[in-house]
Regions:
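Short, well-ordered beta-strand segments in beta-rich or mixed alpha/beta enzyme
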Residues: 33-42, 73, 78-106
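Surface-exposed, polar helix/loop patches in the mature regions of secreted/periplasmic/lumenal proteins
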Residues: 94-132
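C-terminal segment of N-terminal export signals and the immediately downstream linker at the start
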Residues: 20-49
Length: 133
């Protein structure tokens, strides 16, 4: 039976679609992680030295091995809207593989040292911990 070009094109297209479909459905779901987001309000927000000391202390936390990602920042100068709270002075966002690693971080000597050396700088701290979905 002779093979024509249309049959070949159809077969290739169907095979390619099947491969894409199979590959997409076989992709593993991303693993859930713990995100630890902390907001700090300084006792003296006008003090550059206090802010710099807090940021330096937060940077030192990067040495804790269970931290997968560490971001440190200050309020962005984005559009002012009712839903945006930019009243904090410094924030840090960390990612952990699981709750056990977050506990290791909490108990780690570097974290304990950070709290001891920088705790006098802030008047308020709010923590949001979440499990990614």
């Amino acid at each position: 039976m002779p093979v024509n070009r249309r049959d070949v094109v159809k077969a290739v297209a169907l095979g390619g679609a099947a491969m894409v479909s199979d590959g997409a459905s076989a992709a593993p779901a991303p693993e859930a992680r713990i995100v630890h987001h902390v907001f700090f309000w300084l006792k003296r927000p006008e003090s550059t030295a206090d802010k710099d000391q807090l940021i330096a202390g937060l940077r030192a936390l990067a040495e804790i091995p269970v931290i997968r990602n560490l971001q440190i920042g200050v309020p962005a100068s984005t559009e002012q809207r009712d839903v945006v709270d930019s009243s904090f002075d410094v924030s840090e966002l960390m990612t952990f593989d699981n709750v056990a690693d977050q506990k290791v971080y909490q108990d780690h000597p570097i974290h304990q040292d950070f709290v001891a050396k920088c705790g006098h700088l802030w008047r308020k701290v709010i923590v949001y911990d979440m499990l990614t979905v």
